[in-house]
Amino acid sequence: MQTSDTRALPLLCARSVYKQYSGVNVLKGIDFTLHQGEVHALLGGNGAGKSTLMKIIAGITPADSGTLEIEGNNYVRLTPVHAHQLGIYLVPQEPLLFPSLSIKENILFGLAKKQLSMQKMKNLLAALGCQFDLHSLAGSLDVADRQMVEILRGLMRDSRILILDEPTASLTPAETERLFSRLQELLATGVGIVFISHKLPEIRQIADRISVMRDGTIALSGKTSELSTDDIIQAITPAVREKSLSASQKLWLELPGNRPQHAAGTPVLTLENLTGEGFRNVSLTLNAGEILGLAGLVGAGRTELAETLYGLRTLRGGRIMLNGKEINKLSTGERLLRGLVYLPEDRQSSGLNLDASLAWNVCALTHNLRGFWAKTAKDNATLERYRRALNIKFNQPEQAARTLSGGNQQKILIAKCLEASPQVLIVDEPTRGVDVSARNDIYQLLRSIAAQNVAVLLISSDLEEIELMADRVYVMHQGEITHSALTERDINVETIMRVAFGDSQRQEASC
């Protein structure tokens, strides 16, 4: 996507950057360059060092040694304010907005001459096709819209170096295309973009160059056109991976507790004409031992439905039947006791206590069930069981959840849900922002859970993920399910997209 072969001095040149945490080398002499008008994609497994490198460039974290050259000027260390002044803006994977401020206030926060910025903000909103009510509270937005607000904050600051950390993780294909169109306009003005993503098709579409990090080093770097997909995947995950959980992992993953066993195919969760905030007249059945996909565009009402099932939102009409009994009036805790468990979309704000220990987080739901009191030895043993089952990487049980990479945080959250002995497991965007390796681990895990006759409701914006994982698929459009479940050959990206966009005519698969 580079607009010209003639390039001036690099916008950014990181040289021999080292960083260590608690005696562990996180970055080992990294060299990284970004030119004007180019997209440089940065890939790597969870814990490879991508986020640490970007935080150093953005002035959030100091390097132990090394230099940053910004448009020809050398710096040993930056602060966030200085980085902003130099035109560097990091759009984080987990949006950092003020939930009690309006969308407009969040976008304009920290800017001078706010009145002069209003027209620019409106122009950006129009260019990206955003339909925000600027006076709404940021806390009311879903993850995809919060991500877009963060990107707008960066664009409002006339950033010359824009770092996008998984910017499309929760965006629909249409929203992604609008974003890419806007990024192309920025590239034409000489802006350079560091694009962190695990989606190889998107990277091939937008990136001029690719660098792959592994274990704190640059394992592979080159022009996108010269690197094969096999080269990239091999650089990210050099070890040969098993296609399914090992026998040992399956042994450690046997779900705890006296969970009622249902024969595969037994209806476990039934929704009858459910109406609530963001959805209406939703009916479906979820069976033991199946993975039921719930697809739809962002804003279709999927997360609102999931939160209502778990008791986090008020049900306005209809019935929720769990094992043949209505649970409409039960609290979240009572639903949890009956085996209804929810893995939320936003792991950092809703799923984990980032300042609590890993052992505490894994056992958090069972703490509540037994009176909140933690038992350290038992919790540590539980964490060790899931470490072996899920291949979670950490140093000690007492370390805070925030110290883990995104993929390992997600595995801790999954372990937390499994420890509650689910009969029904609702997973909302379970692979958002995790790398290829961790994504495969999670897929294997969900299949293993379903094989134990747990009923799994998989909510995902990744239609290829839905196609790969789901036994049946319902598609929500503007808060409703207007079609019967897709099955077998009907489960494909094209058909799902058609229904998601409200196409009343879908092609039935021929027998």
Swiss-Prot record:
It is a peripheral membrane protein. Induction: In the absence of AI-2, repressed by LsrR. Induced by AI-2, via release of the LsrR repressor. In the absence of glucose, induced by cAMP-CRP by direct binding to the upstream region of the lsr promoter. The keyword Cell membrane applies. SMART domains: AAA. Disruption phenotype: Serina et al. reported that the transposon insertion mutant is unable to grow in rich medium at optimal temperature (37 degrees Celsius), whereas it can grow in minimal medium at 37 degrees Celsius and in LD broth at 15 degrees Celsius. In contrast, other studies showed that the gene is not essential for growth in Luria broth (LB) medium at 37 degrees Celsius. InterPro entries: AAA+_ATPase, ABC_carbohydrate_import_ATPase, ABC_transporter-like_ATP-bd, ABC_transporter-like_CS, P-loop_NTPase. GO terms for biological process: autoinducer AI-2 transmembrane transport; quorum sensing. CDD domains: ABC_Carb_Monos_I, ABC_Carb_Monos_II. Its EC number is 7.6.2.13. Residues 12-240, 240-503 form the ABC transporter domain. It catalyses: ATP + H2O + (2R,4S)-2-methyl-2,3,3,4-tetrahydroxytetrahydrofuran-[AI-2-binding protein]Side 1 = ADP + phosphate + (2R,4S)-2-methyl-2,3,3,4-tetrahydroxytetrahydrofuranSide 2 + [AI-2-binding protein]Side 1. PROSITE patterns: ABC_TRANSPORTER_1, ABC_TRANSPORTER_2. Pfam families: ABC_tran (PF00005). It is an enzyme of class 7 (translocase). One of its GO terms (cellular component) is membrane. Keywords: ATP-binding, Cell inner membrane, Cell membrane, Membrane, Nucleotide-binding, Repeat, Translocase, Transport. It is found in: Cell inner membrane. Belongs to the ABC transporter superfamily. AI-2 autoinducer porter (TC 3.A.1.2.8) family. The complex is composed of two ATP-binding proteins (LsrA), two transmembrane proteins (LsrC and LsrD) and a solute-binding protein (LsrB). Part of the ABC transporter complex LsrABCD involved in autoinducer 2 (AI-2) import. Responsible for energy coupling to the transport system. This is Autoinducer 2 import ATP-binding protein LsrA. The lineage of its organism: Bacteria, Pseudomonadati, Pseudomonadota, Gammaproteobacteria, Enterobacterales.
